[in-house]
Swiss-Prot record:
GO terms for biological process: quorum sensing; regulation of carbon utilization; regulation of DNA-templated transcription; regulation of RNA stability; regulation of translation; regulation of translation, ncRNA-mediated. Pfam families: Hfq (PF17209). It comes from Pseudomonas aeruginosa (strain ATCC 15692 / DSM 22644 / CIP 104116 / JCM 14847 / LMG 12228 / 1C / PRS 101 / PAO1). GO terms for cellular component: cytosol. The keyword Transmembrane helix does not apply. This is RNA-binding protein Hfq. It comes from the Bacteria. Belongs to the Hfq family. InterPro entries: Hfq, LSM_dom_sf, Sm. GO terms for molecular function: RNA binding. Transmembrane segments: none annotated. Residues 9-68 form the Sm domain.
């Protein structure tokens, strides 16, 4: 795992596992809402009434609907599509 993913992957994985509703703002200003179904290095699958594949390079901000605690650094992160 590259250094750039040391925060991103555990954060997205926590949002996925806890099924936290999120708002995802794209760089063009569009707001998407739903739950993170899965993710990999390049995309996030966002589920609402339909599933959408959102490319990470198009994302500006991910806002959870409630505060989220990241797992401690002692635990290895699980893959996003587990």
């Amino acid at each position: 795992m590259s250094k750039g993913h040391s925060l991103q992957d555990p954060y997205l994985n926590t949002l996925r596992k806890e099924r936290v509703p999120v708002s995802i703002y794209l760089v063009n200003g569009i707001k998407l809402q739903g739950q993170i179904e899965s993710f990999d290095q390049f995309v996030i699958l966002l589920k609402n009434t339909v599933s959408q594949m959102v490319y990470k390079h198009a994302i500006s901000t991910v806002v959870p609907s409630r505060p989220v605690r990241l797992p401690s650094g002692d635990q290895p992160a699980e893959p996003g599509n587990a």
